[in-house]
UniProtKB/Swiss-Prot annotation:
Organism listed in the record: Gluconobacter oxydans (strain 621H)
Function of the molecule: Catalyzes the hydrolysis of inorganic pyrophosphate (PPi) forming two phosphate ions.
Keywords (A to Z) from UniProt: Cytoplasm, Hydrolase, Magnesium, Metal-binding
Pfam families reported in the protein's UniProt record: Pyrophosphatase
Protein encoded by which gene: ppa
Residues bound to Mg(2+) 1: 65, 70, 102
Cofactor(s) the record lists: Mg(2+)
Matching CDD domains: pyrophosphatase
Name listed for the protein in its UniProt record: Inorganic pyrophosphatase
Top-level lineage group: Bacteria
GO molecular function, one term: magnesium ion binding
Cross-referenced PANTHER family: INORGANIC PYROPHOSPHATASE
UniProt binding sites for Mg(2+) 2: 70
Length: 173
């Protein structure tokens, strides 16, 4: 897969594309190799936990950690790794890890992809248990890995997520 040929979206930062690397429910961390475009197994999670949502990145972006901007997409079904999904950002999980700042843009499928989340416009519209599950996963998923750690510092609104997306787009140019 040549990620450089995938558009970051139709109406940035409100209508974006997310390349899915990890399906919801996976205990395997996959990554798209920057050089070959192949989907490779980065590692198996050391903790007995599974990703709470589809996980991937926004193509054409460069986040503060030197990788494309990370995104989670809440979906009604598992999405195959390597798929590109049209999504709407609704907020952001703010975190730090052993490598520094590491935000996760929280998204839902665009209404044209599936209407289940058509009334969700902010992370505040999500059930509290969904936010708690996402927070819990990211606070704990590296617990058993040597020299790795994560600190969740809070949630941000759609406007702040949009600012981070636009900064990551500018950084990639």
């Amino acid at each position: 897969m040549d990620v450089s040929k995938i558009s970051p979206g139709k109406d940035l930062p409100n209508d974006i594309n997310v390349v899915i690397e990890i399906p919801q429910g996976s205990q395997v961390k996959y990554e798209v190799d920057k050089d070959s475009g192949a989907l490779v197994v980065d590692r198996f999670l050391f903790t007995p936990m599974a990703y709470p949502a589809a996980y991937g990145f926004i193509p054409g972006t460069l986040a503060a950690d030197g990788d494309p901007a990370d995104a989670l997409v809440l979906t009604p079904a598992a999405v195959v790794p390597g798929s590109v999904i049209r999504a709407r950002p609704i907020g952001m999980l703010k975190m730090e890890d052993e490598s520094g700042q590491d935000e996760k843009i929280i998204c839902v499928p665009h209404d044209k992809v599936h209407p289940q989340f058509s009334n969700v416009h902010s992370v505040d519209d999500l059930p509290e248990i969904t936010k708690k599950a996402i927070t819990h996963f990211f606070e704990r998923y590296k617990d058993l890995e040597p020299n790795k750690w994560v600190k969740v510092t809070g949630w941000a609104d759609k406007a702040e997520a949009g600012k981070v997306i636009m900064e990551a787009l500018a950084a990639a140019k």
